[in-house]
Structures are given as C-alpha cells and as structure tokens.
C-alpha cells in the first residue's frame, strides 16, 4: 500500500533515492501544514471580524481539530512514505541473507522497491550469483584436481614400472650382456630420451667390443705366426752355427797342416811326395771348407729372409695394436657419454623430487619415481666406473703389448743385422778358403819342380799360414756372431710368449661380455675374422 502511495505521490527520480524520498515527504507535509494553517487562520480571522465569540470559538476549535487531523494525516504520510515496508524489507533481506549464509543459494531476492533498499536486494542477488558461480567453479576445479591426481598416480605407477624395467636391462648390461636394449612402454618424453640415448650407446659399445675381440684374435694369430717364423729362424741359426763350427774346425785343421808344412819345408826335396800327399789332403779339406762356407751363406740368406718376414709380421702386429688402442679410446668416449646420461638421470630425479614437493600430500608416487630414477642413475654410474676400470686395464695391456712388439721388432732388426754380418763373414771365409785352395793346387802342380821353387813354395806356405790364421779368426768371429744371433732369437721367443699371454689375457677379459656378433658366432659356429679383414 505504501509503495503504491509513494508511487502516486512521488516522481520516479525521487522514488529511486531513499534520502530524496524523505526530503520530498517532509517538504510535502510542511507545505500541507502551512496551507491548512493559512486556511484555519483565515476562518478564525473572518469569525473574529464578525465579532461573534461563538463563531470565533467554533472556528478555533475547527482549526485545532483540523490541525490534529492534519497531524494524523501527516504522520500517516510520513509513516507510509518513510517507514512503509522498509523494516519488513530489511527483515526479509536479513532472513534471506541468513539462509544464504547457511548454504541455501536458491533464495529468491526480488523486490519492487526502487531505492537503496532495492539496490541492496540487487547487490545481495549479485553476490548470491557470484557465490554460486564460485562454488560451481570450485566444484569443477576439485573434479579436475581429482582427475589430475588420478592421472598423476597412473603416471607414477607407469614410470615406476618403467624404471624397474630399465634398471633390470641396465643391470644385465653392467654384467657384460651388451645385447640388451631398452624398450620404453610409456609416452613419457624423458623415458623415451633415455631409451634412445642408452640404446645408441649400447650399439656403439657392442660394435667396439666386437672389433676389439677381432683385433685380439688377430693379434693372437699374428703372435702364433711370428712364433712359427721365429722357430724357423732358430732352426736356421742352429744350422748356421753348425756350419760355422765346421768351418772353424776345418780352418783349425788347415792351420795346423800349414804350420806343419812350414816346419818341414827345409826338407822339401826329401819330402816331395809327402808334400804332394799333404797338398791333396789340404785341397780336399779346402774344398770341403768352401762347400761348407757356401752352404752356411745360403742358410744365412734364408735366415735373413725369414727374419725380414718376422719383422714384417711384427710391424703388422704393432699396427693392429695401435688400432686396438684407438678403439679402446673410443670406448672411453662412450663411457663419458654414459656418465653424461647418468648425470641427466640425476637431474630427472631432482625434477621428480621438486614435482613431488609441489604436489604436497600427493607426492608419494613422485618420491618413489625419484628414488627409482636416482638409484638407476647410481647403477649407471657404477657400471660406467666398471667400464672405465676395464678400459684402463685394456689400455695398460695394449700399451704393454705395443711396447713388447716394438722391442721384438728392434730385436728382429738386430737379428737381421747380425745374420747379415754372419753372411759377410762367411763370404770372407769362402774367399779365404778359395784362395787357400788355389794355393794348394798350385803347390800340387809345382811338386815336380819342387827343387827349383823351394823358396817360392816357402813363401806361399807362409802366405797360406797367414791366410789360415785369418780364416780361423773369421770363423771364430762368425761363431760368436751366430751365438749372439741365437740369443737374440731366444729373446724374440720370450717376447712372443709374452705377447701371446697378453693376447690370451685380453681375449679372456673380453670373453666376459656378450654381444650380438658373439652370439651369432656361437650359433653359426663361424671363425672370427682377423683385424685385416675389416
């Protein structure tokens, strides 16, 4: 009712302001009171002008009654305008606000008031709509969080299982089975990156280990070939030694014979037949010495050829071991790459720990994954250190083998020089024996004219004695040279034995690893290719 009155009495602009409405009502009441007072005053004045006291009294009473009635009307207007349903509206709004505080957001907040009370209703309605929207957003966010938590738990479980699989494969690789490969069963980019890097690394290690095995086999085969050639050289040296000994013995016999001839040359005339016979014996001995010297020279030349072959084989072995050393260095680089992967895995574990800390109460899965990845990194680092130790051992053995082979090459070169010296000595011996043989032949031919050429024969015998002494000295020198050569060959044998032992040790070290090539070789029963076939 009051709203209808105010709508009728007040303009729209005033109705929208509670303060304006109050001012308008007070102005209207004041104006109405002044108007009624003026009317009452006019009636009282008119009655007084007539001089009728009763009329004045009646006019005064009427004015007072009118004022009382006007006061009631004014109070009613003020109550209807200012009070109206304000208290009821505020009480209703308070009740509805209390229901909203209890969680009832379906409360109707509608009013026909157009003043501040109506604005207050509208503000509460907007607040209710905002709270309802916020609650819906919070509900959706909670559902999204629950789904994200569920997905995170699934990812944690998947990563944990994947990490366990990776750990098993890496353990088998660390035990020497280089045929194992990672096969990621997850879409996680970090795990796929680890899979690709690890598989690429294992391919490189497997190829290098295969090459090292082939090189070790080639070194072992070359060592056997060198040993066989060295045995041939040893046998040839023994033949040369025997030949030189025979030459030395023959030269000694020849020297004694020549000295005996020199002592008996004073009685040349009486002993012409004896000289002829002795000359025949000396000629025979000289021919034998010449033949023996020629055979020794041929044997020495054969020894030189075989020593040159030994030297060539040794140089090939040195080249093979240097290539082996280069391959071992490449394994060292792969080992450094493993260490980098281990470092990256540690970083992944740190990231997982950080994500676990961010996830608050839901961090158990992340923590487990972080621990698993960290353990995986530590195992990878341990495998890397073991591979580094193996590489260091192989490098030390390879360097020792290269040094031994080079020393063997030096010994072989010295042996070749020794044999060449022996050949030169034998050639001098042969020349001396040939000259001795020529002299003896001349003595034999001049036996009929011995009396006339006694002095000449004496001179020739003296020359022959000097030549025989030189021959004996050369033969002794050749014998010493041959003994030195034999010692050099024995040293070569010792070096070859050391090389064979080191090659066997390297093969035994590599046999602890499994590769695809080794598995194929076991299945097909095919021989291992030598390093030169690569």
Curated annotation (Swiss-Prot):
- UniProt keyword Ligase, yes or no: no
Give each disulfide bond as a residue pair. Answer: none
Query: What spans does the record annotate as topological domain Cytoplasmic, numbered to this chain?
Result: 1-22, 82-534
Q: Which GO molecular function terms does the record list?
A: identical protein binding; photoreceptor activity; transmembrane signaling receptor activity
* Native source species: Natronomonas pharaonis (Natronobacterium pharaonis)
**Which InterPro entries does its entry note?**
Chemotax_Me-accpt_rcpt, HAMP_dom, Htr2, MCPsignal_dom
Stretches assigned to coiled coil: none
Keyword Endoplasmic reticulum listed? The answer is no
Point to the regions of Low complexity compositional bias: 463-487
Q: Where is this region: Disordered?
A: 463-534
Query: What keywords does the record list, in alphabetical order?
Result: Cell membrane, Chemotaxis, Chromophore, Membrane, Methylation, Photoreceptor protein, Receptor, Repeat, Sensory transduction, Transducer, Transmembrane, Transmembrane helix
Domain Methyl-accepting transducer residue range list: 229-465
- Places the protein is found: Cell membrane
The biased composition feature labelled Polar residues covers 502-512
Q: How does it sit in the membrane?
A: Multi-pass membrane protein
Please report which protein family the annotation says this sequence is part of.
Belongs to the methyl-accepting chemotaxis (MCP) protein family.
Segments in the Extracellular topological domain: 44-59
Q: Which domain of life is it from?
A: Archaea
Give residue ranges for domain HAMP.
Answer: 84-136, 157-210
For this protein, the parts annotated as crossing the membrane are: 23-43, 60-81
Q: What is this protein called?
A: Sensory rhodopsin II transducer
Regions of biased composition (Acidic residues) lie at 516-525
Q: Name one GO biological process term.
A: signal transduction
A GO cellular component annotation here is: plasma membrane
What is the protein's known function?
Transduces signals from the phototaxis receptor sensory rhodopsin II (SR-II) to the flagellar motor. Responds to light changes through the variation of the level of methylation. Also acts as a chemotransducer.
Task: Identify the main location.
Answer: membrane
């Amino acid at each position: 009712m009051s709203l209808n009155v105010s709508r009728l009495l007040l303009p729209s602009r005033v109705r929208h302001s509670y303060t304006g409405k109050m001012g308008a009502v007070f102005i209207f009441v004041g104006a109405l009171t002044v108007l009624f007072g003026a009317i009452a005053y006019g009636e009282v004045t008119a009655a007084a002008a007539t001089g009728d006291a009763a009329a004045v009294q009646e006019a005064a009473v009427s004015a007072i009654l009118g004022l009382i009635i006007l006061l009631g009307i004014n109070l009613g207007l003020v109550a209807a305008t200012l009070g109206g349903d304000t208290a009821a509206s505020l009480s209703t709004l308070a009740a509805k606000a209390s229901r909203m505080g209890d969680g009832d957001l379906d409360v109707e907040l509608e009013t026909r008031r157009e003043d501040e009370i109506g604005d207050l209703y509208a503000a509460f309605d907007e607040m209710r709509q905002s709270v309802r929207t916020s609650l819906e957003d919070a509900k959706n966010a909670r559902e999204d969080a629950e789904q994200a938590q569920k997905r995170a738990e699934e990812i944690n479980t998947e990563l944990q299982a994947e990490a366990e699989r990776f750990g098993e494969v890496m353990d088998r690789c660390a035990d020497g089975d280089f045929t194992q490969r990672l096969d990621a069963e997850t879409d996680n980019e970090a795990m796929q990156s680890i899979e690709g890097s690890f598989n690429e690394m294992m391919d490189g290690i497997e190829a290098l280990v295969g090459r090292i095995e082939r090189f070790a086999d080639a070194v072992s085969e070359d060592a056997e070939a060198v040993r066989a050639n060295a045995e041939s050289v040893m046998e040839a040296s023994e033949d040369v030694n025997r030949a030189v000994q025979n030459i030395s013995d023959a030269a000694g016999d020849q020297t004694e014979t020549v000295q005996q001839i020199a002592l008996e040359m004073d009685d040349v005339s009486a002993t012409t037949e004896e000289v002829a016979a002795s000359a025949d014996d000396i000629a025979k001995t000289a021919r034998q010495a010449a033949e023996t010297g020629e055979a020794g020279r041929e044997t020495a030349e054969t020894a030189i050829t075989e020593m040159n072959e030994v030297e060539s084989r040794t140089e090939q072995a040195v080249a093979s071991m240097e290539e082996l050393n280069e391959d071992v260095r490449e394994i060292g680089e792969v080992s450094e790459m493993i260490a980098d992967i281990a470092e990256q895995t540690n970083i992944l574990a740190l990231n997982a720990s950080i994500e676990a800390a961010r996830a608050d109460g839901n961090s158990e899965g992340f923590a487990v994954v972080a621990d698993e990845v960290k353990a995986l990194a530590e195992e990878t680092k341990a495998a890397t250190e073991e591979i580094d130790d193996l590489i260091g051992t192989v490098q030390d053995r390879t360097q020792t083998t290269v040094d031994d082979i080079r020393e063997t090459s030096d010994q072989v070169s010295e042996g070749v020089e020794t044999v060449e010296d022996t050949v030169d000595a034998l050639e001098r011996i042969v020349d001396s024996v040939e000259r001795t043989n020529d002299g003896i032949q001349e003595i034999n031919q001049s036996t009929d004219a011995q009396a006339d050429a006694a002095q000449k024969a004496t001179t020739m015998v003296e020359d022959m004695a000097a030549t025989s002494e030189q021959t004996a000295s050369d033969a002794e020198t050749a014998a010493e040279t041959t003994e030195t050569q034999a010692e050099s060959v024995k040293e070569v044998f010792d070096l070859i034995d050391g090389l064979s032992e080191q090659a066997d040790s390297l093969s035994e070290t590599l046999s602890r690893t499994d590769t695809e090539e080794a598995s194929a070789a076991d299945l097909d029963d095919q021989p291992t290719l030598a390093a030169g076939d690569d």
